[in-house]
Curated annotation (Swiss-Prot):
Keywords: Cell inner membrane, Cell membrane, Heme biosynthesis, Membrane, Transferase, Transmembrane, Transmembrane helix. It comes from the Bacteria. NCBIfam families: cyoE_ctaB, PRK04375.1-2. This is Protoheme IX farnesyltransferase. It is found in: Cell inner membrane. The lineage of its organism: Bacteria, Pseudomonadati, Pseudomonadota, Alphaproteobacteria, Hyphomicrobiales. It comes from Rhizobium etli (strain CIAT 652). Pathway: Porphyrin-containing compound metabolism; heme O biosynthesis; heme O from protoheme: step 1/1. CDD domains: PT_UbiA_Cox10. The chain crosses the membrane at residues 32-52, 53-73, 93-113, 116-136, 152-172, 180-200, 226-246, 248-268, 289-309.
Length: 316
């Protein structure tokens, strides 16, 4: 069965399924959603000023629901290729546990709900950025870029980079140079992260015709690009210290983490072409996840430490 045939077969399924709550939760891409929630929370913490704790909780929940909605829409559209790729074949739609029409309705309802509640409860700037993020991921990336260009991850990575900017906007009702730097850290991190995955999943992407960079330009070009983006990410991650919204101590931590990130990318660059085990690529993929969590954790710890010092100084 071809990708097109499989897509048509899935589309004919108009009957209501007997999906469980767990199946619907899986549609939300919970692992991706956890990263979105974490970086959005970082934006809330790092932004100057304060937000009512209840409104902050509502903001995080809306961002989480919006991220889950875009994940559901992505799974709806990609059900045809998900059924072929070993990494995604057990997802609810290709596995037959949820009908495509149900997934589409689920994603659309959650999208509208998350944007409306965020706008009404917090502010419409953050809601507007959330709406654009959902649209960008579900339409621009999923329906257009992913299957048409090897730069899909580079451009499409913007969708995953918006959450800290949304969190920041929830507090300040503005987009600033600081929130743009938080955006850029994730935006520049994304290619190295996903191309490491694409290297050891080349056959899967080739089977479904998704033009990932390793399949289109080869392993050597991909490895060079991975190193370049790792270097850019490491530099950008130090900028909060340079711009003054993080301390020198944070800058040292970010520099050390960046050095390890670059080292792992160089290990991938030195990996022989055609290496079937792809161990350096797998290590880079795993470390890149830790790296992003560590950078944003360090930023939040640094911010909280500064607040405690300021509070202690003011109470003397």
């Amino acid at each position: 069965m071809t990708v097109i045939d499989n897509h048509e077969a899935l589309a004919k399924d108009g009957e209501l399924s007997e999906a469980s709550a767990r199946d619907y939760f899986e549609l939300l891409k919970p692992r991706v959603m956890s990263l979105v929630v974490f970086t959005a929370f970082a934006g809330l913490v790092l932004a100057p000023g304060q937000i009512n704790p209840v409104l902050g909780l509502i903001a995080i929940l809306c961002i989480a629901v919006g991220a889950g909605a875009s994940g559901a829409l992505n799974m709806w559209y990609d059900a045809d290729i998900d059924a072929i790729m070993s990494r995604t074949a057990k997802r609810p739609i290709p596995a037959g546990r949820i009908a495509p029409s149900e997934a589409l309705a689920f994603g659309l309802v959650l999208s509208c709900f998350s944007v409306a509640i965020l706008g009404l409860a917090v502010n419409w700037l953050s809601a507007g950025i959330l709406a654009f993020t959902i649209f960008f991921y579900a339409v621009i990336y999923t329906m257009w870029l992913k299957r048409s260009t090897p730069q899909n991850i580079v451009i499409g990575g913007a969708a995953g980079a918006f959450p800290p900017m949304i969190g920041w906007a929830c507090v300040t009702n503005s987009v600033t140079i600081e929130s743009t730097v938080l955006f850029l850290i994730i935006f520049l991190w994304t290619p190295a992260h996903f191309w490491a995955l694409a290297l050891f999943k080349m056959r899967d992407y080739e089977a479904v015709g998704v033009p990932m960079l390793p399949n289109v330009s080869g392993e050597r070009v991909t490895k060079h690009q991975i190193v370049a983006y790792a270097v850019l990410t490491a530099i950008c991650a130090v900028l909060p210290s340079y711009l003054g919204f993080a301390s020198f101590a944070y800058g040292l931590v970010a520099a050390a983490l960046g050095a390890i990130f670059i080292y792992c990318s160089i290990a991938v660059w030195r990996m022989p072409d055609g290496d079937l085990k792809m161990i350096p690529a797998k290590k880079l993929f795993a470390f890149s996840i830790f790296y992003l969590f560590a950078i944003f954790s360090a930023l939040m710890i640094d911010r909280l430490a500064a607040m405690l010092v300021s509070y202690a100084g003011g109470s003397l």
